[in-house]
Regions:
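Domain-scale selection of a single, long terminal region
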Residues: 183-187
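Feature activates predominantly on carbohydrate-active enzymes
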Residues: 1-180
Length: 187
């Protein structure tokens, strides 16, 4: 059975030593996987202007990953893809990628630049994490999702299509094949 510990760097920057102590404690408690929510705490080139001043280099984080693996902790990267975009969308270079100009929490997925940014960031994560079994693409708390005119029209069209065929489901499914995230939407 997988016992996953969520290590969230959203509001916290730990030193390498603090992270190692945390990993030691987590392994001692019987966890066997770490969900790594890194945000701006590793120096990703794709979002370079947004990086925390004390962020770890990729080399430093790779050493931490190796240590984590040596403790029997499977790494699971977590990348926020709809909401929780404040660490990127709060930066002036990325304001055009917001769902609504006045809110910095949600990406506008109708914009090709957003899909390109997230694809590049996913590639960086995959390169950094190496051989992984799982990749968590976060999509919660996207409070302004589907509110720009383009997204709202697409959402309305989907709702109308579902009603027309008698489908009342509110979920959205994405199926991915093995080729590094080549996904297809389904519903």
């Amino acid at each position: 059975m997988q016992r996953i510990f969520h290590l969230d760097f959203n509001f916290l920057m730990l030193t390498k030593e603090e992270i190692r102590r945390q990993l030691d404690a987590v392994a001692a408690m019987g966890y066997n996987a770490i969900l790594w929510e890194l945000e701006d705490k590793v120096r990703f080139e794709t979002i370079a202007p947004c990086i925390h001043p004390e962020a770890l280099s990729k080399e430093e984080f790779a050493e931490i990953l190796a240590y984590s693996r040596s403790l029997g902790l499977e790494p699971i990267p977590l990348l926020q893809t709809l909401g929780h975009g404040e660490y990127v969308l709060g930066h002036e270079d990325f304001v055009p990628l917001r769902e609504l100009p006045e809110w910095k929490d949600c990406y506008c997925v109708s914009k090709p630049a957003v899909r390109n940014l997230l694809s590049l960031l996913i590639e960086e994560y995959l390169d950094l994490f190496g051989d992984i079994k799982s990749f968590h693409l976060g999509g919660d708390e996207a409070y302004s999702f589907a509110q720009c005119p383009v997204c709202a029209a697409k959402a309305e069209k989907i709702v109308l299509q579902r009603k027309a065929r008698g489908d009342q489901r509110q979920d959205h499914q994405v199926s991915c094949s093995g080729d590094r995230g080549r996904c297809q939407e389904g519903g």
